[in-house]
Amino acid sequence: MGRFIFVSFGLLVLFLSLSGTAADCPSDWSSYEGHCYKPFNEPKNWADAENFCTQQHTGSHLVSFQSTEEADFVVKLAFQTFDYGIFWMGLSKIWNQCNWQWSNAAMLKYTDWAEESYCVYFKSTNNKWRSITCRMIANFVCEFQA
């Protein structure tokens, strides 16, 4: 009887310790390094995809990459959901144009751009990031911190 209790207690401790590893993400999301990810095979332009992500879960946005390992995880996950191609990431020039500066160091106050702001997508044929008009339609991956 003592051995049964010991083994049962050991299994309970093991179960409780393992249950916290992926329990922070909803069941239809995937977990990696404290973040939850979900690819969507619902092509949208960048702004609509970002808006869609914010409605899926508190704190959710289009995916951002902090390491090669994270990018590899997300790419594999994404292409299990949709075929190879492209998908939106959360990187864009929409929100912050302070990267632009005149050569005389004057701040950029007036603009007359010919094109819309650019957004970044991941291209599977060479695993590189590319920028294009934010109006393009693409699949996307949402992410939030668990």
UniProtKB/Swiss-Prot annotation:
PROSITE patterns listed in its UniProt record: C_TYPE_LECTIN_1 (PS00615), C_TYPE_LECTIN_2 (PS50041)
Query: As annotated in Swiss-Prot or TrEMBL, what is the tissue specificity of this protein?
Result: Expressed by the venom gland.
Signal peptide coordinates: 1-23
Where is the protein localized?
Secreted
Which keywords does this chain's UniProt record carry? Answer: Blood coagulation cascade inhibiting toxin, Calcium, Disulfide bond, Hemostasis impairing toxin, Metal-binding, Platelet aggregation inhibiting toxin, Secreted, Signal, Toxin
Q: Which family does it belong to?
A: Belongs to the snaclec family.
This one is known as Snaclec anticoagulant protein subunit B
Source organism (scientific name): Deinagkistrodon acutus
Q: What is the lineage of its organism?
A: Eukaryota, Metazoa, Chordata, Craniata, Vertebrata
